[in-house]
């Protein structure tokens, strides 16, 4: 399999995304984006068991330190972020050090935020090992930790030096996490590319069988969609990047109310995508057949299409107001005018939203 490359250029900060097989064994590639002689690999207990030792061997001629997180969203906190910084300082890492995020979205987010803050900013490389991180979390420079009040409330924009996607890491990804990652691929198609959505409908059976040829193609397309949006609007100033939050205002509220880790992020995103599509249909933006196609595709993946019955409408609405997409005390929701065409709207008032959440 030929390694594919997607080039990102955010504010004159270019970096590559590599997508291929056996990239974690490619010494030249993994050393190419490290400018100094120090690295620190941040991973979690689950991923480290599979991939840490081979990656450390690549950097055997470097000062190579490691920090291993417990596995789970509930550990993406200021406490563990501070522990990473303490390890960097205590091991005397300099400004030319490079952090390597080996893991899923949690590892990438907290590692990137540590890199953004240590000595006012050092390099980091994303090595995402979950499908969700490969198509979304590792691309675009958003780094953050959670706070009890809300998800990703504390963070920074800090672009990686490279994103290295080894498809072989998907072989060790549990089925539930693999399917959760599909939600972000569906989201990318819904935002910008109706043809891509149709391709997903046609190829989903093969994708769920982890066909690497098809997976490489859809990961590349999802990465290109995110690349184009991030290149145009790195820090969500124009509204273009806000489109990437389709379904996420609902999803983040669901995650917080259930307790981080009870639902995987992609599972909450799936329910959020359906809520956004249903609301779009209610407001006469999206036709019923398109809504049905979205529900059918997510159901085929075995992802949730309803928010949990344990959450009531008042709780969900209140939690949604802790979202970063609130401006002038109004929720800015991402809605769909068609498959492949998302828009930002502040034309949904509380009364309408509460009625929608209560009655569907």
Swiss-Prot record:
Top EC category: lyase
UniProt KW Cell cycle keyword: no
Enzyme Commission number(s) from the entry: 4.2.3.4
Main localisation: cytoplasm
Keywords in alphabetical order: Amino-acid biosynthesis, Aromatic amino acid biosynthesis, Cobalt, Cytoplasm, Lyase, Metal-binding, NAD, Nucleotide-binding, Zinc
Catalyzed reactions: 7-phospho-2-dehydro-3-deoxy-D-arabino-heptonate = 3-dehydroquinate + phosphate
UniProt pathway: Metabolic intermediate biosynthesis; chorismate biosynthesis; chorismate from D-erythrose 4-phosphate and phosphoenolpyruvate: step 2/7
Location(s), subcellular: Cytoplasm
Cofactor(s) required, per the database record: Co(2+); Zn(2+); NAD(+)
Cofactor detail note: Binds 1 divalent metal cation per subunit. Can use either Co(2+) or Zn(2+).
Pfam families per the UniProt record, alphabetical: DHQ_synthase (PF01761), DHQS_C (PF24621)
Family: Belongs to the sugar phosphate cyclases superfamily. Dehydroquinate synthase family.
Biological function: Catalyzes the conversion of 3-deoxy-D-arabino-heptulosonate 7-phosphate (DAHP) to dehydroquinate (DHQ).
Protein name: 3-dehydroquinate synthase
Organism placement in taxonomy: Bacteria, Pseudomonadati, Pseudomonadota, Gammaproteobacteria, Legionellales
